[in-house]
Amino acid sequence: MAAGADVPCAVLALLVLGSLAAGGDATAGFIKSPLSQRRLTQDSVELHCEAVGSPIPEIQWWFEGNEPNETSAQLWDGAWQDRVQINATYNLHSTSTIYIANLTSDDSGTYECRASNDPDRNHLSKSPKVKWIRSQANVLVIERPVITGQYSSSADKVVLSCNISAPPTLIKGHKWMLGDKVLKTDESDASSYISYTIEGKVEDHSGVYECIYNTNPVAKGNVSIEVEPQVVAYKKSEHGNEGDVGVLTCKSPSYPPVDHWAWYKSGQTVPLESSAGIYNISRTGNKTELRILKLNIEQDMGDYSCNGTNMKGSGSATVNLRVRSRLAALWPFLGIVAEVLVLVTIIFIYEKRRKPDEVLDDDDGGSAPLKSNATNHKDKNVRQRNAN
């Protein structure tokens, strides 16, 4: 039915836009109407309306409660103790969205979107020539059901459970979520009692878990696992050069978030504080960072402790800081130079010792050809005698 209802709206929009292109006037008409909805108390609701016309029509929102003698009243941005917000735009056509927060049962009733482009639509004494067009949506606010959530834990397992009483409609499944992550989905279970098992220690799985029942409207409960901060160091050991900036980081993934962070140097009971030219400490939620602006090899080297505290207790971690002298970076280069010098010296000594041996070898090589020549002469004489 929604698709069929959109067809006349689309046709009307084309007719009005065609009239606008031709430069003529056109009475106001809806191209989107608000839809009826069901909500639970403490939830919020949003209704949307769009209209076309020439000139561009004005849109207003009106409300009439379910009480027998209640009359219709216009809604304004900021009404009902600032629970009502209305956003409207007037460009090629009119759009308006009304948002109502923290619903109560008194908010049930008929919400009406009105549109008109008659010049006299808001005149106090003159009646408009064209009546306001109207589109209505019913909002039913149902009392929120009671959902009891709890957990139990052992050495290696955590069991979450929820139980709903007086669901608004039949239950058609459920799911478990942690933040934006879906942990488990069951679309066939119609039970009011549901559970979810987590393998591991309770300290490693803190947070706010949601149990969501597939009813109309959707009913949500939560199970909160709260532990003391499980503080860990980003690196257990950090290195820095003298004169540079040293950065030590700690974090806690636990829930509730850390309320207070403190840094201590080994052997000191007074926490470090940010001071110009020495320390800069940042604390952002579950993360803290200690910056030592100019590392000193004598004063800054050692162990540092980061301590986090929340409503459940406190936790800490230790980071070891090692500071190197600026000359430390030259040692590898000096080592290479020393190796090259030793190698050159060895080659030089070897060459010096090898030269006398080469001279002796040259003398022996000069006498050898003489013996060879004498032998050749003897061979020639022997061949001559044989020839004779």
UniProtKB/Swiss-Prot annotation:
Cytoplasmic side: 345-388
Stored SMART domains: IG, IGc2
Cleavable signal peptide: 1-21
Molecular function as annotated in GO: cell-cell adhesion mediator activity; signaling receptor activity
Protein origin, superkingdom: Eukaryota
This protein's record includes keyword DNA-binding: no
Single biological process term from Gene Ontology: angiogenesis
PROSITE patterns to which the protein is assigned, alphabetical: IG_LIKE
InterPro entries registered for this protein in UniProt: Ig-like_dom (IPR007110), Ig-like_dom_sf (IPR036179), Ig-like_fold (IPR013783), Ig_sub (IPR003599), Ig_sub2 (IPR003598)
Protein name in the entry: Basigin
The gene coding this protein: BSG
